[in-house]
Amino acid sequence: MARTDPSSTGSNGISAFLVDATLDGIRVGDPPKMLGNEGSHACYVWFENCEVPADSIVGGQEGRGLKAALRGINHARLHVAATCVGQAIRLITEMTEYASKREQFGKRIGEFGQIAAMLADSQAEMAAGRALCLDCAKQFDAGDQIPFIDIASAKLFCSEMVSRVADRAVQVMGGLGYMEDLSDVPRLFRDVRLFRIFEGASQVQQGNIARSMMKDLSLIHISEPTRLSA
């Protein structure tokens, strides 16, 4: 994105471009080593006196790039929230299978109260996050103008939830949950850390939610439950 109208302010005058990486003046760096999510690459891109053709404007209309991006951010944040739920299900499955098989002092470790609490809390929090995602998805499918606060709440809760679940999975599985050669849990533990950062960090979501609440008290609501057909 670039401001194509220097006299404009705010989101006005910012245009989005789809740029050919082979143009003169573009330099693409090597992907940096990341903590997790190694299947998703990111890299630095430098633009030095690069001339971008006018027909590279996304949507063909100048000055609407940031507005278009903001319109799509709700979908992106719901996608992240749903991904968090999926990762949580995987982690819960891993630690529950382990707790059901690993025995200490003559019984399965999942029967010990503290381990059982971690399993139960993880399941309950995952189910709550899934309900948030389904409620938002239902509104999207119905073509409703979904409240910004609903998406922000789903993104905030689910990203924080999956981090707690990942931490519990390592704790339940003990040394096995810390050894990459023996379990996928260490990789998942690293991967889910990103969800609290990208598409709006948790602190950004908290600020957005609080501002929305104070601006319009009617946003503090409980959506109608999804009715399943018989």
Language-model features and meaning:
Residues 7-11, 35-39, 61-62:
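Solvent-exposed alpha-helices and their adjacent loops that cap or buttress functional pockets
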Residues 12, 40-42, 190:
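Short, solvent-exposed loop/turn segments at the edges of secondary structure
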Residues 1-28:
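A short core secondary-structure module
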Residues 11-13, 28-30, 53-61:
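Short, charged, solvent-exposed linker or helix-capping segments at domain edges/interfaces
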Residues 1, 16-18, 42-49, 194:
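Conserved hydrophobic/aromatic beta-strand scaffold that supports enzyme active sites
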Residues 222-230:
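A short, hydrophobic C-terminal helix/tail in secreted or cell-surface proteins
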Residues 44-46, 60, 64, 71-219, ...:
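Alpha-helical interface subdomain recognition
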Residues 22-51:
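Flexible, small-/acidic-enriched active-site or ligand-binding loops
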